[in-house]
């Protein structure tokens, strides 16, 4: 770094360096020109540094060694501990701490100003310096206090130290150069010290904390160690200096204010017993990171920011680079807003370091990638400016200098040739930061409809709804009924105000969207609001995000099923925030990765939370699929693909839980061949719509369970051994229980196990050999029809391969086509008689003549009588690809296959849409005449052909 132009008061820095060298007896010319230049530069930019090298003879040779790379890896903390071990009293402790601190901070200032450390490393080094000082001082003071007053002990007899919690920038390894440190003091167990007049532990730890604050904070002839702020403790300045774990728990559960969550985002134990410190950190976690999405954070941050700005204006300190517009605090608020809203559900955001959080916000697309990158760069720039301001005199300032000399030095130290160039860059950064802050945190514009719709009379409501013409009266009635409902009447003032905002915006959206049935859509959404009224945070979400409310109106207009889905899992409202993800269902691999991330934040033994989270996961992705379906983003066949992928991911996760549950009690059965798979010897076979990759929105799961590769007399290897068959049966029982349990959000899936060998009277899990024997020698034709659509979906791949071989062997057998035709026709007639809706004017899309079941039976018949000569057609399990396969072997003519495929896809599409409308799979008898005629013709030609 070239020296700055000589300015008054700084031109003598070089000569001052020469005098200092001479003072300590170091030959000035023996050091390299570049090293001497670095000292000159830093002495110009930091009076603090100049003062330290004047007082401490050891600094210059240490810096020279560092500069030339001749010093082995330093351990400042160990150096401090060694020095403190030699002190005899508190005055000696204070002197050693200050001298050590000044030396370390001078080294950091030199490395920072000369560009030898990046700003991230500088902030970390300062934080580590503070933590070393805290830990070392506390250890000395604790030992001293124990000698004086006795040792506080736990119930198990071990010594119990004070726990020191670092808040704010100290906790996040982000301390600036002349920062104060925010500390909270706590201890785990209450008690009394030994002795006739023994003090309580509270008194002991209070004295200890007071001593620590004094040792660190007091200003002596050697300066201070770190300024200490203890106002973030429970009850603030009016509360005790030290709190017990129980008191702390009661406070944060019942009395803590919302703004205290922000202070706790970075909390970290920085002194005392490490195990106790981790316990305190874990305690704060649920207070900071809520399990639900708390959009009230935006309003709270706006209020806090407004108070800060008002205070700055009052003190005429608007040019503050930390608290002013576009300053450091606004960047921190942006990151913390997302942490506090989403951190409870997204473990990646549970990080103390703001730069890590911002980077992850970009990666998770919660912020635009470019925006996140800019904020990281802006944060580093502003923190560098902050350090330069404070390094000058070791003062805690955030104000830009006024004098020409100081301005020139600041610009130079930041790498700019002029103050004007630096200020231009600073203003650019702050302007863009403030723009982003406003976009993220600022209150959204209010709609024109601002009437007190929850409190006014019917006349005001009618006036507000005048633009809806004939629907106004019915909508007025719906709103009157809604606001009189018990959940709405019980709302607190804050939630009621948020709901007031939402209702006004809702009516504006209904008018702007020109909903064809505003009464019905309003009614659905009001029912949803009534069901979520106990969680006012969801009203905050909709009030803060007009686009989410807009998406809700569109989806509610298209599907009451979606509204009911959201009512069962209100967390889904968060999915409406970003149309890019709302209308973009995930692939099988992406679903698996998201599930892994989602569950990684939960305790592995917390099955209840795992299952609740799994229900939310399933519902969120069902919503994405339905939204993309409604908006015609994906075709009908892909809808079923996505629903099938989702079900498979859920099944795999439930299998993991069930397996873990059984294995913890009984161990696992030994398999005959060595394997490293997760579920040795066990496989899940999907039948029906899941097996055929044709799942619908309300489909249940037809499942069959197999085991293989396990000796018939094998037992598990755990503390309570059971037979292999019994172990696998318990896994299945647990799986079914988890899948069908009625929890908030409903069951995951309904499960049907009747397609297993011997149906409801058969074993829950079949040995593969027995399953094969049953399929070959005992199964009915309809069971072999079902096998056409069966496939392996989870478990041991070896069991999957065994099942594939069994299925191929069974399906590719020679059959009497005459008997198969009779069986298929008979079964279909029974189904029509018992399942079809035969009312006049109605066409049953699934069971009616010429409907879906007829197409599926034609395909299954074709496979059963053709696979012996064309075994390759058994490769597929879904109807559409089987139609193509049957066309390829000339079982179907080209026109027949095309007409059946077209009819099948159109029918399935209508069934999906009806499910979203919560309507049965029925159409008017006048609909689909061409499809019905075509299917009937093929049915008659193939299934009802004369049997001789």
Curated annotation (Swiss-Prot):
Q: Which GO terms describe its biological process?
A: regulation of glutamine family amino acid metabolic process
Task: Cite the entry's keywords alphabetically.
Answer: ATP-binding, Magnesium, Multifunctional enzyme, Nucleotide-binding, Nucleotidyltransferase, Transferase
Region described as Adenylyl transferase: spans on this chain? 451-948
What Enzyme Commission number(s) appear in the record? Answer: 2.7.7.89, 2.7.7.42
- Key word Acetylation present: no
Any single Gene Ontology cellular-component annotation:
cytosol
Task: Name the cofactor(s) required for activity, per the record.
Answer: Mg(2+)
Under the heading Pfam families, the entry gives: GlnD_UR_UTase (PF08335), GlnE (PF03710)
What reaction gets catalysed by this protein? [glutamine synthetase]-O(4)-(5'-adenylyl)-L-tyrosine + phosphate = [glutamine synthetase]-L-tyrosine + ADP; [glutamine synthetase]-L-tyrosine + ATP = [glutamine synthetase]-O(4)-(5'-adenylyl)-L-tyrosine + diphosphate
Sample GO molecular function, one term: [glutamine synthetase]-adenylyl-L-tyrosine phosphorylase activity
Q: Region Adenylyl removase: what ranges?
A: 1-445
Q: Which PANTHER family match?
A: BIFUNCTIONAL GLUTAMINE SYNTHETASE ADENYLYLTRANSFERASE_ADENYLYL-REMOVING ENZYME, GLUTAMINE SYNTHETASE ADENYLYLTRANSFERASE
Q: Its function?
A: Involved in the regulation of glutamine synthetase GlnA, a key enzyme in the process to assimilate ammonia. When cellular nitrogen levels are high, the C-terminal adenylyl transferase (AT) inactivates GlnA by covalent transfer of an adenylyl group from ATP to specific tyrosine residue of GlnA, thus reducing its activity. Conversely, when nitrogen levels are low, the N-terminal adenylyl removase (AR) activates GlnA by removing the adenylyl group by phosphorolysis, increasing its activity.
Q: Which family does it belong to?
A: Belongs to the GlnE family.
Task: From the Swiss-Prot or TrEMBL record, give the protein name.
Answer: Bifunctional glutamine synthetase adenylyltransferase/adenylyl-removing enzyme
Name the gene that codes for it.
Answer: glnE
């Amino acid at each position: 770094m070239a020296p700055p132009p000589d300015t008054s008061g700084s031109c003598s820095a070089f000569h001052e360096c020469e005098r200092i060298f001479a003072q300590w007896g170091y030959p000035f010319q023996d050091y390299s020109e570049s090293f001497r230049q670095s000292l000159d530069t830093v002495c110009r930019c930091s009076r603090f540094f100049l003062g330290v090298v004047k007082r401490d003879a050891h600094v210059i040779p240490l810096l020279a060694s560092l500069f030339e790379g001749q010093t082995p890896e330093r351990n400042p903390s160990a150096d401090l501990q060694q020095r403190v071990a030699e002190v005899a009293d508190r005055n000696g402790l204070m002197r050693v701490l200050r001298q050590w601190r000044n030396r370390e901070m001078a080294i950091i200032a030199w490395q920072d100003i000369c560009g030898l450390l990046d700003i991230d490393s500088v902030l970390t080094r300062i934080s580590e310096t503070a933590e070393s000082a805290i830990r070392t001082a506390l250890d000395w003071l604790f030992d001293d206090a124990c000698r004086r007053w006795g040792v506080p002990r736990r119930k198990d007899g071990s010594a119990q130290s004070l726990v020191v919690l670092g808040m704010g920038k100290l906790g996040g390894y982000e301390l600036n150069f002349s920062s104060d440190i925010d500390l909270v003091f706590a201890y785990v167990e209450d008690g009394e010290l030994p002795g006739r007049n023994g003090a309580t532990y509270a008194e002991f730890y209070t004295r200890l904390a007071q001593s620590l604050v004094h040792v660190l904070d007091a200003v002596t002839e050697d300066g201070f160690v770190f300024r200490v702020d203890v106002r973030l403790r429970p009850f603030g300045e009016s509360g005790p200096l030290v709190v017990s774990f129980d008191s702390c728990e009661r406070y944060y559960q019942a009395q803590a204010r919302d703004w205290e969550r922000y202070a706790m985002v970075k909390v970290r134990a920085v002194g005392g017993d490490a195990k106790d410190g981790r316990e305190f950190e874990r305690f704060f976690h649920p207070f900071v990171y809520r399990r639900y999405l708390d959009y009230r954070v935006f309003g709270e941050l706006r209020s806090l920011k407004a108070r800060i700005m008002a205070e700055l204006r009052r003190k005429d300190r608007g040019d503050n680079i930390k608290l002013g517009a576009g300053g450091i605090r606004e960047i921190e608020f942006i990151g913390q807003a997302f942490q506090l809203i989403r951190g409870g559900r997204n473990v990646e955001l549970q990080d103390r370091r703001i730069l890590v959080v911002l980077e992850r916000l970009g990666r998770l697309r919660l912020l635009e990638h470019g925006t996140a990158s800019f904020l990281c760069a802006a944060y580093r720039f502003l923190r560098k400016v902050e350090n330069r301001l404070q390094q000058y005199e070791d003062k805690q300032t955030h104000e830009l200098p006024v004098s020409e000399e100081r301005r020139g030095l600041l610009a130079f130290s930041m790498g700019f040739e002029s103050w004007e160039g630096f200020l231009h860059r600073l203003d650019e950064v702050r302007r863009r930061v403030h723009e982003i802050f406003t976009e993220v945190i600022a209150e959204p514009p209010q709609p024109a409809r601002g009437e007190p719709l929850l409190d006014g009379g019917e006349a005001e409501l009618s006036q507000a709804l005048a633009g809806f013409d004939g629907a106004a009266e019915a909508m007025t009635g719906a709103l009157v009924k809604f606001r009189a409902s018990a959940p709405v009447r019980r709302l607190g003032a804050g939630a009621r105000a948020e709901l007031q905002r939402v209702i006004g915006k809702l009516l504006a959206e209904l008018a702007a969207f020109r909903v064809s049935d505003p009464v019905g859509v309003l009614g659905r959404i009001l029912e949803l609001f009534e069901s979520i009224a106990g969680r006012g945070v969801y009203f905050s979400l909709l009030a803060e995000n007009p686009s989410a409310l807009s998406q809700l109106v569109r989806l509610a207009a298209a599907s009451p099923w979606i509204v009911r889905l959201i009512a069962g899992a209100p967390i889904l409202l968060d999915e409406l925030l970003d149309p890019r993800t709302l209308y973009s269902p995930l692939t099988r691999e992406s679903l698996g990765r998201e599930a892994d991330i989602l569950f990684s934040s939960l305790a592995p033994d917390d099955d209840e939370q795992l299952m609740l989270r799994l229900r939310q996961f399933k519902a969120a992705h069902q919503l994405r699929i339905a939204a993309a379906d409604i908006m015609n983003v994906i075709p009908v066949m892909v809808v079923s693909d996505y629903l099938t992928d989702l079900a498979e991911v859920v099944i795999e996760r439930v299998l993991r839980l069930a397996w873990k549950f059984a294995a913890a009690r009984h161990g696992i059965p030994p398999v005959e061949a060595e394997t490293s798979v997760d579920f040795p010897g066990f496989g899940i076979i999907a039948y029906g719509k899941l097996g055929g990759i044709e799942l619908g929105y309300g489909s249940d799961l037809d499942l069959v369970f197999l085991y293989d590769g396990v000796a018939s007399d094998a037992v598990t290897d755990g503390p309570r051994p059971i037979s292999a068959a019994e172990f696998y049966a318990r896994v299945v029982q647990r799986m079914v229980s988890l899948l069908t349990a009625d929890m908030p959000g409903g069951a995951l899936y309904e499960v049907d196990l009747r397609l297993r060998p011997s149906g409801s009277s058969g074993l829950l899990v079949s040995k593969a050999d027995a399953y094969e024997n049953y399929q070959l020698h005992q199964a009915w034709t309809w069971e072999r029809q079902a096998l056409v659509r069966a496939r392996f979906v989870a478990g041991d791949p070896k069991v999957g391969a065994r099942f594939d071989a069994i299925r191929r062997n069974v399906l590719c057998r020679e059959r009497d086509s005459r008997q198969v035709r009779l069986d298929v026709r008979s079964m279909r007639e029974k189904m029509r008689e018992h399942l079809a809706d035969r009312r006049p004017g109605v066409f049953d899309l699934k069971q009616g003549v010429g409907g879906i079941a007829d197409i599926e039976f034609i395909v299954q018949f074709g496979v059963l009588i053709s696979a012996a000569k064309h075994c390759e057609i058994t490769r597929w399990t879904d109807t559409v690809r089987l139609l193509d396969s049957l066309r390829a072997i000339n079982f179907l003519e080209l026109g027949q296959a095309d007409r059946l495929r077209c009819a099948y896809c159109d029918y399935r599409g209508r069934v999906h849409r009806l499910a979203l409308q919560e309507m049965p799979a029925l159409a008017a008898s006048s609909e689909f005449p061409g499809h019905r005629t075509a299917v009937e013709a093929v049915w008659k030609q193939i299934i009802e052909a004369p049997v001789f």
